[in-house]
Amino acid sequence: MNNNLQGDAIAAAIDVLNEERVIAYPTEAVFGVGCDPDSETAVMRLLELKQRPVDKGLILIAANYEQLKPYIDDTMLTDVQRETIFSRWPGPVTFVFPAPATTPRWLTGRFDSLAVRVTDHPLVVALCQAYGKPLVSTSANLSGLPPCRTVDEVRAQFGAAFPVVPGETGGRLNPSEIRDALTGELFRQG
């Protein structure tokens, strides 16, 4: 996609996000659906769309670490833990950090932590940079159906009018690996 078309698609996506709605976009492995993490209305729309309970918690995807800092508590990280995390970012590894009390429950669910990732997908980086903050990100699929890997699959599952940022996934076969930021424990193999 040329830069003008990508810029137009990102601008249109930001308009949708500002309306507290949900968008779809390509990530490292599959298409994701996402929204403004600070909008309870938008997150509830996403959870309803996915038929996902709020208590499960969500993942935030960001252009850089600074975008994630308001949502996580990194004060307990040692220098070695920081090095480990930053050696994997940007990239397809999600880390679960402690969350401060100010992080909304609609993001953390029943947990006192939050899963976050600094992406290396160029389109998502550009989207988060243009929006100025991270996005809630979960796989684009309706309950019981496989995650979408193309724009056509997103439209087939969510409807022709669903707002999609067109582009290619990063080509990975599996969703992101998920690890505990403090212990390194593997929660999901990538």
From Swiss-Prot:
Source organism per UniProt: Escherichia coli O157:H7
Q: Which family does it belong to?
A: Belongs to the SUA5 family. TsaC subfamily.
Q: Where is the YrdC-like domain?
A: 7-190
Give a yes or no for keyword ATP-binding in this entry: yes
A Pfam family name for this chain?
A: Sua5_yciO_yrdC
- Single GO BP term: tRNA threonylcarbamoyladenosine modification
Listed GO CC annotations: cytoplasm
The protein's name is Threonylcarbamoyl-AMP synthase
For this protein, what is the EC number? 2.7.7.87
- Localization (cell): Cytoplasm
Q: What is the lineage of its organism?
A: Bacteria, Pseudomonadati, Pseudomonadota, Gammaproteobacteria, Enterobacterales
Q: Which reaction does it catalyse?
A: L-threonine + hydrogencarbonate + ATP = L-threonylcarbamoyladenylate + diphosphate + H2O
Major location, coarse class? cytoplasm
Q: Which PROSITE patterns does the UniProt record give?
A: YRDC
Q: Which keywords does this chain's UniProt record carry?
A: ATP-binding, Cytoplasm, Nucleotide-binding, Nucleotidyltransferase, Transferase, tRNA processing
Annotated TM spans: none
State any single GO MF term: ATP binding
Q: Function, please?
A: Required for the formation of a threonylcarbamoyl group on adenosine at position 37 (t(6)A37) in tRNAs that read codons beginning with adenine. Catalyzes the conversion of L-threonine, HCO(3)(-)/CO(2) and ATP to give threonylcarbamoyl-AMP (TC-AMP) as the acyladenylate intermediate, with the release of diphosphate.
Q: Which domain of life is it from?
A: Bacteria
